[in-house]
């Protein structure tokens, strides 16, 4: 019997009676012999199944893959082929996605403290939208627009004031987070009003990211309740619900399934009119 919990392994993983582990029909011993160690193995069938489960729940072009979880040309193409948009958080990640053949309009440009050159590259590439993190970033975009660049589609990152069950270093939704526009101190509404009045941006929505490797679906429900209330009050066409769905790393650790997470988000957004677009970010769970 394997001492490794099956939920820690890809869906195609098999441990035979001799204790030999295979992934996708190939033993890890054979892979180690061919490629050496340490060796990271990604199973394409497992990855595509994860993508398809998320897309089945939310629809094509509504699921955004966090490339910071893992990015190479093959992974970028796989996510794109399966109907996911790509979340890129640096100029380098955007370059890698574009170089892999992913169109700019299927990339969402994330990240805090984006440089002027990164913003210029994203606008020139006509990314799907830019997630604006601060008033300084609005300043930079307005400067680029004054230089003649087109007004990009933007979503504003809102800090909803929600604490999550994850490591403090990767929790990003609480009031003292350094990311986004704080809802409870009024910054969020000030940012929305400024963006709506600006000719330098096309404000299309709001976004939140409550943390990475979140293991409690209740945390997502709490954040959704706050964000949906705000979203309905400002009457914008798009809402993105972020904060990566967690995965188990050790024996005995449990994580919500993709379907459990999807059910919570779908219930929490049920009051949103059908003509509005809801995007989700499943994080490393893909």
Q: Which residues make up each language-model segment?
A:
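Structured alpha-helical segments in the cores of large, soluble enzyme domains
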Residues: 50, 159-160, 184-201, 224-236, ...
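Rossmann-like NAD(P)H-binding beta-loop-alpha module
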Residues: 142-146, 151-152, 167-188
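Active-site-proximal beta-alpha loop/turn segments in soluble metabolic enzymes
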Residues: 76, 123, 161-180, 204-219, ...
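Non-cysteine beta-strand/loop elements that form the S-adenosyl-L-methionine
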Residues: 87-92, 110-114, 151-171, 201-208, ...
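Active-site-proximal loop/turn and secondary-structure-junction residues that shape catalytic pockets
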Residues: 69-71, 92, 113-115, 134-136, ...
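A charged N-terminal "starter" segment
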Residues: 1-153, 189, 193, 197-203
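Alpha-helix N-cap and loop-to-helix initiation/capping positions
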Residues: 42, 114, 133-136, 176-183, ...
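C-terminal active-site-proximal or functional interface alpha/beta core segments in diverse enzymes
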Residues: 212-286
């Amino acid at each position: 019997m394997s001492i490794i919990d099956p939920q820690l392994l890809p869906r195609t993983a098999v441990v035979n009676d001799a204790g030999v582990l295979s992934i996708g029909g190939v033993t890890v011993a054979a892979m180690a012999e061919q490629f050496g160690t340490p060796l990271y193995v990604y199973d394409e069938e497992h990855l595509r199944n994860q993508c398809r489960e998320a897309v089945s729940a939310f629809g094509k072009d509504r699921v955004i893959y966090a490339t910071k979880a893992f990015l190479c040309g093959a992974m970028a193409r796989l996510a794109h082929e399966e109907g996911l948009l790509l979340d890129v958080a640096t100029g380098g990640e955007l370059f890698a996605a574009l170089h892999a053949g992913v169109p700019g309009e299927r990339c969402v440009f994330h990240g805090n403290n984006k440089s002027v050159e990164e913003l210029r590259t994203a606008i020139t590439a006509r990314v799907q939208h830019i997630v604006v993190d601060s008033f300084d970033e609005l300043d930079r975009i307005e400067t680029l627009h004054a230089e003649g660049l087109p007004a990009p589609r933007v979503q504003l990152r809102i800090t909803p004031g929600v604490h999550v069950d994850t490591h403090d270093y990767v929790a990003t939704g609480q009031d003292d987070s350094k990311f986004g526009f704080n809802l409870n101190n009024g910054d969020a509404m000030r940012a929305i009003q400024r963006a709506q009045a600006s000719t330098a941006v096309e404000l299309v929505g709001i976004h939140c990211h409550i943390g990475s490797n979140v293991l409690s679906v209740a945390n997502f429900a709490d954040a959704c309740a706050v964000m949906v209330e705000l979203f309905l009050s400002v009457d914008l066409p798009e809402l993105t619900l972020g904060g990566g769905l967690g995965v188990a790393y050790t024996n005995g650790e449990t994580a919500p399934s993709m379907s459990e997470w999807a059910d919570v988000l779908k219930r929490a957004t049920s009051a949103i009119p059908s003509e509005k677009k809801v995007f989700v970010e499943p994080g490393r769970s893909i």
